UniProtKB/Swiss-Prot annotation:
Keywords: Isoprene biosynthesis, Magnesium, Metal-binding, Thiamine biosynthesis, Thiamine pyrophosphate, Transferase
SMART domains for the chain: Transket_pyr
Binding site residues for thiamine diphosphate: 76, 117-119, 149-150, 177, 284, 365
Cofactor note text: Binds 1 Mg(2+) ion per subunit.
Name of the protein described by the UniProt record: 1-deoxy-D-xylulose-5-phosphate synthase
HAMAP family, sorted: DXP_synth
Amino acid sequence: MSKYTILDKINTPSDLKLIPESQLKILSAELRAFLVDTLDVSGGHFASSLGATELTVALHYVYNAPYDNIVWDVGHQTYIHKILTGRKDKLVTIKKDGGISGFPKRSESEYDTFGVGHSSTSISAALGMAIADRLQGKSSNTVAVIGDGAITGGMAFEALNHAGGIKEDILVILNDNEMSISDNVGGLSAHFSKIISGGFYNSIREKGKEVLKNIPPIFEFVKKIETQTKGMFVPANFFEDLGFYYVGPIDGHDVTELVKTLRILKDHKGPKLLHVITKKGKGYTKAESDPIKFHHVAPSFHSGENITTKISKPTYSNIFGDWICQKAAKDKRLVGITPAMKEGSDLIRFSQLYPHRYFDVAIAEQHAVTFAGGLACQGLKPVVAIYSTFLQRAYDQVIHDIALQNLDVLYAVDRAGLVGADGATHDGSFDLAFMRCIPNHVIMTPSDENETYHMLEFGYEYNGPAMVRYPRGAGIGAEITGSLDLELGKAKIVKQGSKIAILNFGTLLPLAKQLAEKYHATVIDMRFVKPLDKIMLDKVSQTHEIILTLEENCIAGGAGSAVNEYFVAKDLSNKIIVRNFGLQDKFLNHGTKDLLLAQSKLCVENISKELDKLI
């Protein structure tokens, strides 16, 4: 007999609605157990979904998705949503080749109303949907679910301001699992929340307002008293000042209370914000104790089977983490900045050693960059540790606030290139293209750990904005040397060959070497995308017939395009054959990195096919 007596009956939200409300608590427990069992096989985002279990159940129990729009932010917390919307049996394939995505994806399910992966987008998207439905005469409801981390993003506040200003009928649910506000979740607060979310209170409140509006002094006095009283327990003032009807905070693990509150709010028109308190990792003791560690789990995390203790090579993030700590010890001007990526960027040790020089600005990439500019103006040396995919969000600041003023800011760009299982929303496919066109920038593409370390040093000492891009995961095991012969805009010949020259930008150097062995080709580690080594390009164009460029970046506008532009300007494009190899002009699905590289023709087999046609 299955241990999922209720869950086995559910494949869609319609099935869920047939379950008696009294059994929703049991269902929530079964969902957690199913999540543990499944991710023990597949791995995936864990703690966030555990924390949002009851909220997800309540939403699909009360609302009629997909007719009603439920919009999720980021997507880490949506595994329960996927289970309840026809993907229960596919969850074991999550983030695998040919499996379902780790994030909501419109092409995957009609219940995934908006594709996400980046933060703070839900309220904007939900507002657009609500207005579109209203303009087309559709009587649907729209809900945005956003976490206390994601709501720190400026885009979320822009959307709140817009929605509140136009009084659009939309519900924003703030899923708050931040422990620092736990003191607010007490008897008085819970009692007050029940009162203000009740239909009787709402009715009296609104009718009373209509009467008192005819007596302005009394109306303003009562409104002020109500706001101040609520403000003693909840952060109502801010949201109500934006035009939202605020309810909460309520217990996000009391599924009965959630269902009751959502039903009431469903009938309350206008912009509403429901503040729910949840615990990340709820129901799994280890995840509750260490939600960061259990944010994402590997297969066998629960059973302990097949877990090895082999020592792996340091990741590129580890190389950065070592460098910044060592540099900070020597230079008190160094300041480290991250937009909510302390763990991922390996800034934990730096934050502990230099807490007054470490700034986690939350999910605020635009602010992070301009903040760095302000620090640089006053003589400090800011280092912005940021993922390639998130650097996109600060593009205007990179141009207007840093490059235009030629400020000393170093961008340590992590997760450059393909990231594998997280898919297109997190791939760092575009940074070379969108950064290369900006004046005053130095752009470096290290080929291994040693070059990464020394290019970070070079970029830090450079007088102006500089960028070092490096991929996710471990390198080749290159030893960090005491020094490296590194000169601005100068490439390095790795292997001398003939006829064919391979210009490598970044960590595809092992691939370049494999091709060189097969074709007796010259291999050049270009190191710099900006400035390019033009002397080297002139030499190569005079001594070789075929030139290949390799990069883990989009071909359009990337490093290879920079080489093409130079050869065209020198009127050499008709005298040599140039072929660019990089990421294709399409978004890739999630999968193993080797598979995705092969799909992008970045492998010996595919490049050989092209070369054989040219020789």
